[in-house]
Amino acid sequence: MVLTPDGEEFMDYARDILNRINKLEHSYRDGSHKKRKFGISVPRACYISAAFAEFSKNIGDGDVEIYYKETNSKKTIQKVLDNEYKLGIIRYSEAYDKHYKTMLEEKGLNCELVAEFSYVLIMSRDNPLASKETITYDDLSSYIEIAHADPYVPTLSMSKVFREELPDKIGQRIFVFERASQFDLLSENPKTFMWVSSASDKILDRYNLVQRVCEGNKKTYKDVLIYHKGYRLSKLDKDFITALCEARRKFLK
Protein backbone atom coordinates (compact mmCIF):
# COMPACT_ATOMS: atom_id res chain seq x y z
CA MET A 1 0.00 0.00 0.00
CA VAL A 2 1.35 3.41 -0.97
CA LEU A 3 0.33 6.45 1.06
CA THR A 4 -0.78 9.55 -0.73
CA PRO A 5 0.74 12.88 0.40
CA ASP A 6 -2.43 13.58 2.37
CA GLY A 7 -2.21 10.14 3.95
CA GLU A 8 1.40 10.69 4.99
CA GLU A 9 0.46 14.01 6.53
CA PHE A 10 -2.36 12.34 8.46
CA MET A 11 -0.05 9.57 9.74
CA ASP A 12 2.52 12.13 10.90
CA TYR A 13 -0.24 13.97 12.72
CA ALA A 14 -1.49 10.73 14.32
CA ARG A 15 2.03 9.75 15.43
CA ASP A 16 2.47 13.19 16.99
CA ILE A 17 -0.77 12.77 18.95
CA LEU A 18 0.28 9.30 20.15
CA ASN A 19 3.65 10.64 21.27
CA ARG A 20 1.94 13.37 23.26
CA ILE A 21 -0.41 10.85 24.88
CA ASN A 22 2.52 8.60 25.80
CA LYS A 23 4.42 11.52 27.34
CA LEU A 24 1.35 12.56 29.31
CA GLU A 25 0.79 9.01 30.59
CA HIS A 26 4.46 8.77 31.57
CA SER A 27 4.32 12.06 33.45
CA TYR A 28 1.34 10.83 35.48
CA ARG A 29 3.03 7.48 36.21
CA ASP A 30 6.27 9.01 37.47
CA GLY A 31 4.52 11.78 39.40
CA SER A 32 6.01 14.69 37.47
CA HIS A 33 2.55 15.98 36.55
CA LYS A 34 1.21 15.95 40.10
CA LYS A 35 -0.17 19.22 41.38
CA ARG A 36 1.85 20.41 44.35
CA LYS A 37 -0.08 20.94 47.57
CA PHE A 38 0.68 22.74 50.81
CA GLY A 39 -1.50 23.22 53.86
CA ILE A 40 -0.89 24.50 57.37
CA SER A 41 -3.10 25.25 60.38
CA VAL A 42 -1.77 27.99 62.66
CA PRO A 43 -2.56 30.37 65.53
CA ARG A 44 -3.66 33.92 64.71
CA ALA A 45 -0.27 35.65 64.65
CA CYS A 46 1.21 38.49 62.63
CA TYR A 47 4.66 36.99 62.21
CA ILE A 48 3.23 33.72 60.90
CA SER A 49 0.96 35.44 58.38
CA ALA A 50 3.90 37.61 57.29
CA ALA A 51 5.95 34.44 56.75
CA PHE A 52 3.10 32.97 54.71
CA ALA A 53 2.92 36.09 52.52
CA GLU A 54 6.66 35.90 51.82
CA PHE A 55 6.43 32.17 51.14
CA SER A 56 3.65 32.79 48.60
CA LYS A 57 5.99 34.96 46.52
CA ASN A 58 8.31 32.03 45.83
CA ILE A 59 6.06 29.10 44.95
CA GLY A 60 7.20 28.99 41.31
CA ASP A 61 5.17 28.57 38.12
CA GLY A 62 3.90 24.98 38.39
CA ASP A 63 0.38 23.96 39.42
CA VAL A 64 -0.14 24.30 43.16
CA GLU A 65 -2.93 24.37 45.76
CA ILE A 66 -2.24 26.10 49.08
CA TYR A 67 -4.39 26.16 52.23
CA TYR A 68 -3.80 28.42 55.24
CA LYS A 69 -6.05 28.01 58.28
CA GLU A 70 -6.05 30.16 61.44
CA THR A 71 -7.59 28.45 64.47
CA ASN A 72 -6.87 27.29 68.02
CA SER A 73 -4.44 24.58 69.12
CA LYS A 74 -7.10 21.92 69.70
CA LYS A 75 -8.44 22.17 66.16
CA THR A 76 -4.95 22.35 64.66
CA ILE A 77 -3.92 19.12 66.41
CA GLN A 78 -7.06 17.37 65.17
CA LYS A 79 -6.62 18.61 61.60
CA VAL A 80 -3.05 17.29 61.52
CA LEU A 81 -4.14 13.96 63.02
CA ASP A 82 -6.86 13.67 60.36
CA ASN A 83 -4.31 14.51 57.61
CA GLU A 84 -6.43 17.48 56.61
CA TYR A 85 -3.22 19.49 56.99
CA LYS A 86 0.29 18.05 56.92
CA LEU A 87 1.72 20.81 59.13
CA GLY A 88 0.39 22.70 62.12
CA ILE A 89 1.62 25.32 64.55
CA ILE A 90 0.17 25.34 68.05
CA ARG A 91 0.54 27.99 70.74
CA TYR A 92 0.49 27.44 74.49
CA SER A 93 1.74 28.84 77.78
CA GLU A 94 5.13 27.52 78.86
CA ALA A 95 3.45 26.33 82.07
CA TYR A 96 1.68 23.65 80.00
CA ASP A 97 4.71 22.49 78.03
CA LYS A 98 4.71 19.06 79.67
CA HIS A 99 0.96 18.60 79.06
CA TYR A 100 1.35 19.27 75.36
CA LYS A 101 4.52 17.26 74.81
CA THR A 102 3.02 14.22 76.52
CA MET A 103 -0.16 14.45 74.47
CA LEU A 104 1.68 14.96 71.16
CA GLU A 105 3.95 11.98 71.87
CA GLU A 106 0.92 9.79 72.62
CA LYS A 107 -0.71 10.85 69.35
CA GLY A 108 2.41 10.14 67.28
CA LEU A 109 3.20 13.73 66.38
CA ASN A 110 6.60 15.38 66.14
CA CYS A 111 6.98 18.79 67.75
CA GLU A 112 9.65 21.41 67.08
CA LEU A 113 9.95 24.76 68.84
CA VAL A 114 9.38 27.71 66.50
CA ALA A 115 9.36 30.64 68.93
CA GLU A 116 9.27 31.54 72.62
CA PHE A 117 8.00 34.97 73.66
CA SER A 118 5.90 37.08 76.02
CA TYR A 119 2.76 38.87 74.87
CA VAL A 120 2.74 42.62 74.33
CA LEU A 121 -0.19 45.04 74.18
CA ILE A 122 -1.45 46.65 71.00
CA MET A 123 -3.94 49.52 70.96
CA SER A 124 -4.94 52.58 68.99
CA ARG A 125 -2.54 55.51 68.99
CA ASP A 126 -5.55 57.45 70.33
CA ASN A 127 -5.92 55.16 73.34
CA PRO A 128 -5.08 57.14 76.53
CA LEU A 129 -2.80 54.27 77.60
CA ALA A 130 -0.64 54.76 74.52
CA SER A 131 0.96 57.88 75.99
CA LYS A 132 1.58 56.42 79.45
CA GLU A 133 5.22 55.88 80.33
CA THR A 134 4.43 52.65 82.19
CA ILE A 135 1.37 50.42 81.80
CA THR A 136 0.31 48.04 84.59
CA TYR A 137 -2.38 45.36 84.82
CA ASP A 138 -4.51 47.70 86.93
CA ASP A 139 -4.44 50.30 84.14
CA LEU A 140 -6.20 47.84 81.84
CA SER A 141 -9.25 47.32 84.05
CA SER A 142 -11.21 50.27 82.67
CA TYR A 143 -10.63 49.32 79.02
CA ILE A 144 -12.13 46.75 76.65
CA GLU A 145 -10.06 43.67 75.91
CA ILE A 146 -10.21 42.08 72.46
CA ALA A 147 -9.63 38.34 72.92
CA HIS A 148 -9.87 35.08 71.02
CA ALA A 149 -12.71 32.96 72.29
CA ASP A 150 -11.17 29.53 71.98
CA PRO A 151 -8.18 28.98 74.31
CA TYR A 152 -7.30 25.33 74.91
CA VAL A 153 -5.10 23.21 77.17
CA PRO A 154 -5.23 19.39 77.11
CA THR A 155 -6.64 17.73 80.27
CA LEU A 156 -7.93 21.07 81.64
CA SER A 157 -11.52 22.27 81.62
CA MET A 158 -12.39 25.24 79.43
CA SER A 159 -13.50 27.22 82.49
CA LYS A 160 -10.10 26.81 84.15
CA VAL A 161 -8.27 27.80 80.96
CA PHE A 162 -10.44 30.90 80.65
CA ARG A 163 -9.70 31.88 84.25
CA GLU A 164 -5.96 31.62 83.68
CA GLU A 165 -5.81 33.22 80.23
CA LEU A 166 -8.50 35.86 80.79
CA PRO A 167 -8.22 37.33 84.32
CA ASP A 168 -11.32 38.63 86.12
CA LYS A 169 -9.91 42.16 86.47
CA ILE A 170 -11.17 42.97 82.98
CA GLY A 171 -14.90 43.64 83.06
CA GLN A 172 -15.45 44.17 79.33
CA ARG A 173 -14.33 41.84 76.56
CA ILE A 174 -15.10 41.39 72.89
CA PHE A 175 -14.35 37.89 71.58
CA VAL A 176 -13.31 37.45 67.96
CA PHE A 177 -12.39 34.42 65.86
CA GLU A 178 -10.34 36.00 63.06
CA ARG A 179 -7.76 38.73 62.87
CA ALA A 180 -9.30 41.15 60.36
CA SER A 181 -12.08 42.15 62.75
CA GLN A 182 -9.69 42.53 65.69
CA PHE A 183 -7.62 45.11 63.82
CA ASP A 184 -10.72 47.05 62.79
CA LEU A 185 -11.89 47.13 66.41
CA LEU A 186 -8.51 48.19 67.75
CA SER A 187 -8.17 50.87 65.10
CA GLU A 188 -11.67 52.35 65.41
CA ASN A 189 -12.27 52.06 69.17
CA PRO A 190 -9.61 53.83 71.30
CA LYS A 191 -10.94 52.11 74.43
CA THR A 192 -9.78 48.67 73.25
CA PHE A 193 -6.53 46.73 73.65
CA MET A 194 -5.28 43.23 72.91
CA TRP A 195 -2.53 40.85 74.02
CA VAL A 196 -0.52 39.59 71.03
CA SER A 197 2.83 38.28 69.91
CA SER A 198 4.73 41.19 68.37
CA ALA A 199 3.23 42.88 65.31
CA SER A 200 5.20 44.40 62.45
CA ASP A 201 5.62 48.14 61.96
CA LYS A 202 3.72 47.71 58.69
CA ILE A 203 0.65 46.34 60.52
CA LEU A 204 0.87 48.97 63.27
CA ASP A 205 1.07 51.80 60.74
CA ARG A 206 -1.70 50.37 58.57
CA TYR A 207 -4.17 50.32 61.47
CA ASN A 208 -2.86 53.34 63.40
CA LEU A 209 -1.77 51.18 66.35
CA VAL A 210 1.03 51.18 68.90
CA GLN A 211 2.69 48.28 70.69
CA ARG A 212 3.46 48.52 74.39
CA VAL A 213 4.90 46.36 77.15
CA CYS A 214 2.85 45.75 80.29
CA GLU A 215 4.86 45.95 83.51
CA GLY A 216 4.72 42.72 85.48
CA ASN A 217 3.81 40.52 82.51
CA LYS A 218 6.13 37.54 82.94
CA LYS A 219 4.14 34.75 81.26
CA THR A 220 5.97 33.03 78.39
CA TYR A 221 4.33 31.35 75.41
CA LYS A 222 5.60 28.85 72.87
CA ASP A 223 4.74 28.32 69.22
CA VAL A 224 5.46 24.74 68.19
CA LEU A 225 5.46 23.12 64.74
CA ILE A 226 3.73 19.72 64.62
CA TYR A 227 3.46 16.96 62.01
CA HIS A 228 3.12 13.17 61.89
CA LYS A 229 6.13 11.08 62.85
CA GLY A 230 7.54 9.58 59.67
CA TYR A 231 6.22 12.38 57.46
CA ARG A 232 8.83 13.64 54.99
CA LEU A 233 8.74 17.39 54.56
CA SER A 234 8.08 18.51 50.98
CA LYS A 235 9.98 21.32 49.28
CA LEU A 236 7.01 23.63 49.88
CA ASP A 237 7.03 22.66 53.57
CA LYS A 238 10.73 23.47 53.83
CA ASP A 239 10.31 26.76 51.97
CA PHE A 240 7.56 27.82 54.37
CA ILE A 241 9.63 26.86 57.42
CA THR A 242 12.52 28.95 56.07
CA ALA A 243 10.20 31.96 55.66
CA LEU A 244 8.82 31.31 59.15
CA CYS A 245 12.27 31.34 60.75
CA GLU A 246 13.14 34.58 58.98
CA ALA A 247 9.90 36.22 60.15
CA ARG A 248 10.48 35.03 63.70
CA ARG A 249 13.93 36.62 63.80
CA LYS A 250 12.51 39.85 62.41
CA PHE A 251 9.39 40.14 64.58
CA LEU A 252 10.19 38.39 67.87
CA LYS A 253 13.36 40.10 69.02
Residue ranges and their predicted role:
Residues L81-K86, D150-V210:
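Hydrophobic hinge/microswitch elements
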Residues V2-D30:
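Alpha-helical "hinge/linker" immediately C-terminal to small N-terminal DNA-binding modules
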Residues A53-E54, K74-Y119, M123:
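Short beta-strand-centered segments that line the small-molecule binding cleft or hinge
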Residues S32, M103-Y119, M123-E145:
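Flexible hinge/capping segments at coil-to-helix
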Residues N19, H26-S27, G31-Q78, L233-K235:
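N-terminal winged-helix
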Residues I48-E54, D97, Y137, S141-L166:
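Secondary-structure junction motif
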Residues I122-A130, K222-L233:
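A bilobed periplasmic-binding-protein/Venus flytrap-type ligand-binding module shared by bacterial periplasmic
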Residues E106-E112, F117, A180-G230:
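Beta-alpha-beta core module
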